[in-house]
């Protein structure tokens, strides 16, 4: 068996039960949890909560580990297990992912999203190929050239698109733009679901892109750093926006949804997975004590936990949007669809909020801000931030 590759084992009933009861029921329970999260809790504007602990809106990476992931991690620490992914936890986690997507697939665990994206893309192309991505894609803006590095030079070709999304027409134009030997041959399309600006591809849009990639013999990669939030928001089965839409390989994110470290690379195109274990090892991505990366996935993929936490984060962002959109000087930049709210704020308001101790990113032009909710965001935090924003904006 290849180190780092998990053999298929029998499906776990808990994942199958989620399908039997319907994904929407799991999402609904998460929304109910979100609505009830602050009942009987006094709000303190100065601290952001009654207990003095404030949840911020800079990134879902700021949040801690979910109780379910933490419990699984602790349980995995009870005894000795084989190393390099040959342990029962890694086998169980990989099996739950296969069951979640309802199809045979190869599953690999890596340390972070940059590794997941870069190694997945490198597997899909040669150095003389190019990768078509949106001009604001994470692989372009926030991965320090890693996709080009790990593919030995495959060029990223940047495409425009409204709301952070690629279109079939844009892909076809890029493929046909040049076909001569002096131009890097397009070989892969990568999309981010949800996008860098918090918008969603619908299943229909993804199927259309998948059909275009098939038409031109391209591979189809999905950056799913917040894949759970997309599934929760769309109310679809994971298969509907991945392999059934033509996706060959998915970077399935766990860190932003409450896992301590580690993403998975899920190959629906099994041929592409051949020798990926060697690529991961060479890139320093083979964890010797792999169970401590994989065990939290077992906890998260039990009884719909992963989806409930994502639905809660989405619901908190929906409430945040509802509370701050009417405030003076606030301009919403993109539709709120998952766990992020993008707004333009006057610079004095941004500074005043920072002075009050709130942490959030301001990286879109002069006043563009991203406010991100996470699995542990509380309603009291949202209302405290909204109240401070209204005060700072003079509303």
What are the language-model segments listed below?
Residues 11:
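Cationic, low-complexity basic patches in intrinsically disordered or flexible, solvent-exposed regions
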Residues 30-356, 361-377, 385-393:
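Conserved PLP-enzyme active-site core in the AAT-like
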